[in-house]
Amino acid sequence: MDPNCSCSTGGSCSCATSCTCKACRCTSCKKSCCSCCPAGCAKCAQGCICKGASDKCSCCA
């Protein structure tokens, strides 16, 4: 279990508008929890539940 998410890492979890998960991949809605990307990163906006602002985001690497 991810200590900050009510699901197993890699399992399904509820994807709200914000997420405090560290490594939980929300397979139930095909989104992952990660830092927000800079504006203009469409890939992150479509496949990420933001947990905090960052100019470096794994979704956009």
Swiss-Prot record:
Chain positions recorded as a divalent metal cation 5 binding sites = 34, 36-37, 50
Please give the GO cellular component terms listed in this UniProt entry. cytoplasm; nucleus
Region Alpha, residue ranges: 30-61
Residues reported in the UniProt entry to bind a divalent metal cation 6: 37, 41, 44, 60
Q: State the InterPro entries in the record.
A: Metalthion_dom_sf (IPR017854), Metalthion_dom_sf_vert (IPR023587), Metalthion_vert (IPR000006), Metalthion_vert_metal_BS (IPR018064)
In the UniProt record, does the keyword GTP-binding occur?
Answer: no
Residues at which a divalent metal cation 4 binds: 33-34, 44, 48
Please tell me where a divalent metal cation 1 binds in this chain.
Answer: 5, 7, 21, 24
Q: Which GO terms describe its biological process?
A: cellular response to cadmium ion; cellular response to copper ion; cellular response to zinc ion; detoxification of copper ion; intracellular zinc ion homeostasis; negative regulation of growth
Q: Which UniProt keywords apply?
A: Metal-binding, Metal-thiolate cluster
Residues recorded as binding a divalent metal cation 2, renumbered to this chain, are 7, 13, 15, 26
Query: Any idea which GO molecular function terms this record carries?
Result: metal ion binding; zinc ion binding
Which residues participate in a divalent metal cation 7 binding? Answer: 50, 57, 59-60
Q: Where is this region: Beta?
A: 1-29
Binding-site residues for a divalent metal cation 3, renumbered to this chain: 15, 19, 24, 29
Q: What does the UniProt function comment say about this protein?
A: Metallothioneins have a high content of cysteine residues that bind various heavy metals; these proteins are transcriptionally regulated by both heavy metals and glucocorticoids.
Which family, according to the similarity comment? Belongs to the metallothionein superfamily. Type 1 family.
Copy the domain comment: Class I metallothioneins contain 2 metal-binding domains: four divalent ions are chelated within cluster A of the alpha domain and are coordinated via cysteinyl thiolate bridges to 11 cysteine ligands. Cluster B, the corresponding region within the beta domain, can ligate three divalent ions to 9 cysteines.
What do we know about how this protein assembles, alone or with others? Monomer.
Query: Which PANTHER family would you find in this protein's record?
Result: METALLOTHIONEIN, METALLOTHIONEIN-1G
Q: Could you identify this protein by its name?
A: Metallothionein-1D
Q: Which gene encodes it?
A: MT1D
